[in-house]
């Protein structure tokens, strides 16, 4: 289970990142959550920008692809994360709204970016 890497305390299952072996090479997947998320307090979540940056610095040299999943409510936060990690992460994907934004693009330093990739789940549901 990959859960937000910036949860500072509590006994939560999983970890905040994983390195997966694929036919294309090693992929580092990082999950971080914006501080405004209503399920956690500011005292519980560390700065997602700095946490993602730290993991990339520690693990990024050992992988072929770096993908960051940023769970946030506001599109402005997701855009900020994309620009913050541009050139350091290969892919930045926003998640939360359940509806894809259909705005894939390549940022100036080469990072692939989508504001929100939508939901993976039940199609016959209210969420």
Question: What label would you give each PLM region?
Answer:
Residues 1-127:
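Acidic, metal/ion-coordinating pockets
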């Amino acid at each position: 289970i990959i859960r937000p890497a910036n949860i500072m305390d509590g006994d939560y299952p999983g970890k905040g990142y994983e390195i997966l072996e694929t036919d294309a090479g090693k992929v580092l997947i990082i999950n971080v959550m914006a501080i405004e998320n209503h399920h956690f307090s500011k005292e519980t979540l560390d700065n997602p920008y700095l946490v993602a940056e730290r993991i990339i610095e520690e693990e990024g040299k050992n992988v072929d692809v770096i993908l960051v999943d940023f769970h946030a409510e506001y599109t402005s936060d997701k855009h900020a994360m994309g620009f913050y990690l541009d050139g350091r992460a290969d892919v930045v994907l926003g998640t939360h709204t359940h509806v894809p934004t259909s705005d894939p693009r390549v940022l100036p330093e080469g990072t692939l970016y989508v504001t929100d990739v939508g939901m993976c789940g039940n199609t016959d549901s209210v969420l």
